[in-house]
Amino acid sequence: MTIIYYFANQKNYLVCGTGNKSEILIGYFTKHGDGACDMEPIGDLYKTEVYRLSEFLNIQEEIIKKPPRAGLWENQTDEDEIGMSYNLLDQILYLYTERDMENTKIAEKLEISADDVDMIIEKIARSEHKSKVPEFPKKTTL
């Protein structure tokens, strides 16, 4: 990222990220790695919406159908690492973050275990620090 920012700075450019809403909400990115950017053009689109946008834009089907993967190790896929499909993840995220639905109600509605919903909600909570300005000490007066 340092090199990318070096060249962006030389030309007064911004660094564009590739994160989508699904990845951002659960913290599926490296804080100062792939998450380091000045803007996220698809940051308010769930992964399933990114797929629909790709189809609308006539992106090659071979690209759309390729399983998302960070490429961290051989045969690694995002969905295996997350623990569920993006389709299910996005439904949970939508109901929890945009409809303020309770865990048990989400599980009922989607006919899944409450443990799966809890796992995602925990990912959201554990990664909250990734989307915030770092903490710093406050000045005090004597």
Residue ranges and their predicted role:
Residues 2-142:
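ATP/NTP-dependent adenylation/nucleotidyl-transfer catalytic domains that generate, transfer
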